[in-house]
Amino acid sequence: MRQNYFLEYVPNAYINLCVDKAKQMANNRFVYDFKAGDKEAVQICAEWLVRYLTKQYSSILEDFVVVFAPCSTQWKYNKRFGYLAAILNVAGIATANEHVHIFGERKPTHNGGSHVVNEDIYHVSVDGEYFKGKQVILFDDLLTSGKTIEDFRSKLEAAGAYVEREIFLARTIHHDPISNRGVLQEMAEGFYEAVAHSKRCFPQGVNINKKSNNNYNKVA
């Protein structure tokens, strides 16, 4: 499965590995703002996504539908991806928000130090008739282990969809994206293997310069 992303996200515990902490912290803040539904952040992400998809698929983009991976609740899903879907639709890119249904709330429970989703209070369903035969491009905000997107992809494929690609706003890494400092430790700790094949959408990367609380100056 092809996986692509726009930004690197470095957890706070590893931020001191970064030679350009200010830049990485700005990238992290952008991810937080997007997840919170900040319209400026969503607008920028939409512009990146439209540009990337148009470049990759050109005239056949109309044959695909962009599907957003489920959040912890339906209202968060609507807030996070509703505006993004509207922008993509204006650009002529189909989305499927109304065909993904989230029931309950995803709450992590501890199991031997790991986090497991309690299926008794959370369930995701998709409209099988709609997705049967559809060519799908999946989008999610953050790629860490890949487990969440893998589970959702399996659900769509079971409904008869063909998932062509997965795209993420950011990929979680536990090393410095500039110097690669810490990458050997990341590999040793098992963080790296599951998503090592993922690639940047734009090889040169993207830079986020935040000018004020709700105003971004974007460079791609």
For each predicted feature, which ranges?
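Long, low-complexity, intrinsically disordered segments
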Residues: 202-220
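Glycine-rich phosphate-binding loops at beta-strand->alpha-helix junctions
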Residues: 70-79
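PRPP/pyrophosphate-binding module of the type I phosphoribosyltransferase fold
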Residues: 99, 107-208
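Short, well-ordered alpha-helices that flank and scaffold nucleotide-derived cofactor binding pockets
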Residues: 51, 86, 90, 154, ...
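Active-site-facing substrate-recognition patch
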Residues: 1-64, 101-135
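Charged helix-capping and loop-helix junction motifs
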Residues: 79-86
